[in-house]
Design a protein with these regions (language model features):
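Short, solvent-exposed amphipathic alpha-helical segments in soluble enzyme
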Residues: 34-38, 62-64, 171-175
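Gly/Ser/Thr-rich loops at beta-strand to alpha-helix junctions
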Residues: 20-30, 52-54
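Long, compositionally biased charged/polar accessory segments in the mid-to-C-terminal portions
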Residues: 71-206
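Short, charged, surface-exposed secondary-structure boundary motifs
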Residues: 52-61, 145
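Short active-site oxyanion
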Residues: 15-19
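Short, acidic/turn-prone active-site loops that include or flank metal/cofactor-
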Residues: 1, 47-54
């Protein structure tokens, strides 16, 4: 219902603009929706460099198993940077205590549980119709070493005039360097995540 909620918010706030952020499929779907509804000029649309989206069923049942055993989940992060950018910590909070979710993360990175469409994603390219793409700037220590931050560097790809406008609004708050698509190459800007050879076996066992 998020598209309708956004549209209703824009109708209720005719003098305001809105920032929509989502995965490539979500953001391009919203782009088409906003064009049909005639509100494209009031929204900035940003998508994320995406590894793929896991099965909602898998997370729902995994979370339910934790809550049934330990209590209600009140917080979730997959990228806590206490150990640095390259070794993120994933955990949930239950009753104020941190509980690791390593099993779920392992399945995610093993490429067993992504949605079938993710393995054929048409948005795994630098040519996108959103205003801007954001993501981790992996390997920046090799291409722009003097700008590397062990806590992480973000990558912005600007696609449209709206994207330029958005960047101009925020650039005063940023420390940034200009790059190019060769320097900032990321695997999921070129091709979708490959399906694991163990995917079918995983779901049969699940």
């Amino acid at each position: 219902d998020i598209y309708r909620e956004v549209y209703h918010w824009l109708m209720e706030n005719p003098k305001k603009e809105l920032l929509f952020v989502g995965m490539g499929c979500q953001s391009d779907g919203f782009r088409k929706f906003s064009e049909i509804k005639g509100v494209r000029d009031r929204v900035y649309i940003v998508d994320i460099i995406c590894h793929g989206s896991p099965s909602p069923k898998l997370w729902r049942e995994y979370a339910e198993s934790i809550q049934k055993k330990d209590g209600k989940i009140t917080y979730l992060t997959f990228k806590d940077k206490r150990n640095g950018w390259k070794a993120p910590t994933a955990y949930v909070k239950v009753n104020g205590a941190e509980r690791p979710v390593k099993d779920y993360v392992k399945v995610f990175y093993n490429r067993c549980a992504l949605r079938p469409s993710c393995y054929e994603c048409p948005y795994a390219t630098t040519e996108r119709k959103t205003d801007m793409t954001i993501g981790d700037f992996w390997h920046i220590e090799e291409t722009i070493p003097d700008f590397y931050d062990p806590n992480g560097n973000s990558l912005f790809l600007i696609h449209t005039n709206r994207g330029e406008e958005l960047f101009e609004k925020i650039q005063g708050y940023l420390d940034y360097r200009l790059s190019n698509t060769t320097q900032c190459w990321q695997a999921n800007l070129e091709a979708p995540t490959q399906k694991s050879e163990q995917r079918e076996e995983f779901w049969n066992d699940y």
